[in-house]
Swiss-Prot record:
It holds the Pfam family ATP-cone. Pathway: Thermoadapter biosynthesis; cyclic 2,3-diphosphoglycerate biosynthesis; cyclic 2,3-diphosphoglycerate from 2-phospho-D-glycerate: step 1/2. This is 2-phosphoglycerate kinase. Its EC number is 2.7.2.16. Belongs to the 2-phosphoglycerate kinase family. Keywords: ATP-binding, Kinase, Nucleotide-binding, Transferase. Its cofactor is a divalent metal cation. Signal peptide: none annotated. Catalyzes the phosphorylation of 2-phosphoglycerate to 2,3-diphosphoglycerate. Involved in the biosynthesis of cyclic 2,3-bisphosphoglycerate, a thermoprotectant. NCBIfam families: PRK04220.1 (NF003259). SUPFAM superfamilies: P-loop containing nucleoside triphosphate hydrolases. InterPro entries: 2PKG, ATP-cone_dom, P-loop_NTPase.
Length: 312
């Protein structure tokens, strides 16, 4: 049977039917830790098996069982267990993933990759939250908010830093810049938890130790903090970003030492709070590591029977 001969298969849900999709199934498998190529191959094999058996309709539960036992039979036991874990959790609980890191370490890229793998429809950058906060807080009240994270120190009153060294001054400015943005971030988290919706929030303003401690205790609020130890790699990220955006390269390079200080500050805060720090050299490796961390946190929510979800 060729690809064009495939029979249209409907997956039955409680409220509606939907066409079987290899892409959806492959995405579910990659979220469980399977390599994308292997995920698509297995999804294609499942479709072929259903076609050969002339299956026109199949329930989500039955499809899930087929996928699970296919994984077991192909010696993917660990992935099979993670696959079921994801299915149990995603519909039952809202998941809030916070991807932090200094400018240029790649929080946006990783956040969108995770959203694609996990099927989370909403990704919010903290720069956007900052713009909203600027509309409600005047420049006279918090001038640091109207600067970049690495230039916020220039808006400090002289009395705030005249007895501090340059690094302390830079970090104080960064903290004053971050604090009002955190109000917006925490409001989004609270609303997501109340409404039962999942979201990924990414950006420089996610700083452990500055956010309310209660979020670190919640198993479905997951902190992922990225870093780049190599100065050369970090600078190359800025160069690459400047080629595809309007962000001025010179401004980043001129303030690179301050950006490094902020990066180290976020790393130290993460370690102080026993939160993961991930070296973001390879996008694929970073995404895989993030998925492993998220899955481990999910195990604390694994208290429900398998239920329907928007994934297979």
């Amino acid at each position: 049977m060729t690809f064009d001969d495939n029979i249209r298969i409907l997956v039955k849900d409680k409220e509606y039917d939907m066409p079987f999709s290899k892409g959806l199934l492959a995405r579910s498998l990659t979220a469980a830790g399977m390599k994308p190529s292997a995920s698509y191959t297995l999804a294609r094999d499942i479709e072929r098996e259903l076609n050969e058996q002339n299956v026109l309709k199949i329930s989500k539960d039955e499809l899930r069982r087929r996928v699970y036992y296919t994984l077991i039979n192909r010696d993917y036991e660990a992935i099979a267990e993670k696959y079921l874990l994801w299915r149990r959790i995603l519909k039952k609980h809202s998941i809030i993933i916070l991807v932090g890191g200094s400018s240029g370490v790649g929080t946006s890229t990783i956040a969108f990759e995770l959203a694609s793998r996990l099927g989370i429809p909403s990704v919010i950058g903290t720069d956007s939250i900052r713009e909203v906060m600027r509309r409600s807080i005047s420049k006279d009240l918090v001038p640091m908010l109207y600067e970049s994270s690495y230039t916020a120190w220039t808006a400090l009153r002289k009395s705030s830093w005249e007895e501090q060294d340059s690094k302390e001054m830079h970090l104080l400015g960064f903290e004053r810049h971050v604090e009002p943005v955190l109000l917006g971030i925490e409001s989004i988290i609270d609303r997501s938890l109340t409404e039962g919706t999942s979201v990924i929030i990414e950006g420089t303003h996610i700083v452990p130790g500055l956010m309310a401690e209660k979020y670190q205790e919640m198993p479905n609020v997951i902190f992922l903090n990225l870093t780049l130890s190599s100065e050369e790699t970090h600078k190359k990220r800025f160069i690459a970003r400047a080629k595809v955006s309007d962000r001025p390269l010179e401004r980043y390079l001129e303030n690179f030492e301050i950006i490094k200080e902020i990066n180290q500050y976020i790393v130290e805060k993460s370690k102080e709070n026993n939160l993961p720090v991930i070296e973001n050299v390879s996008i694929s490796d970073t995404v895989q590591k993030c998925l492993e961390i998220v899955t481990e946190r999910f195990s604390n929510l694994n208290d429900e029977p398998i239920i329907d979800s928007d994934f297979y």
